[in-house]
Amino acid sequence: LISGNDLDLPDEDLNSEVFKNQSSIRTLADTTTFTFVNILRGETSFGTLMDSLGYPCVPSTNDPGPAGLRYFSGGYITDRHGSSDGSVISAIQVELPQPGIRDTGENWSRYASAFAKAIDIYYKFHMGKELEL
C-alpha cells in the first residue's frame, strides 16, 4: 500500500508502475483511461470527489498528501483484498473522524448520501457503469 511519505512525493514520481503496482487500486489503474496519479489524487480521484461534496480528503487535489503528518495507508482488509497483488478487486480505505460525520444521525445520513454520490461518479469515470442509487 502507498504510505503517507509516498503520497508526499511529486506527481511525476508517484505516477509510476512501482507505486501503481503496490497500490490497492492497481487493477482499476490498469483498466481506466486515466493516469494512476489522476485516479489516486487527481481530478477523478475518490478523495477529490468527496472533497467537492464538502468532505476534505487525503489524497485529493486539494490535499495530495499528508504533508508529513500521521496518515493511515490501509489495514489488513485493504491489503488482503485490494488489487496490489494483481487480483481483480480494487479497494479504497476510508477513515472517518467523529466530529462532523459520526457524531449525529443527521451527519451520518448526510455523509452517506455524499459517499454514495461519490461512488456513483467514480464508477462512471473509471468503469463506465452507472449505479442504481
Task: State the predicted function of each range.
Residues L1:
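Short Gly/Thr/Asp-enriched flexible loops that form oxyanion-binding sites at enzyme active sites
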Residues D51, Y55, D120-M127:
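Hydrophobic/aromatic-lined pockets within catalytic cores
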Residues G128-L133:
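Short, highly charged C-terminal tails/helix-capping segments
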Residues S60-F125:
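Active-site-adjacent mobile loop/cap segments within catalytic or ligand-binding domains
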Residues G4-G68:
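Acidic, glycine-rich loop-and-strand cores that form catalytic or ligand-binding grooves
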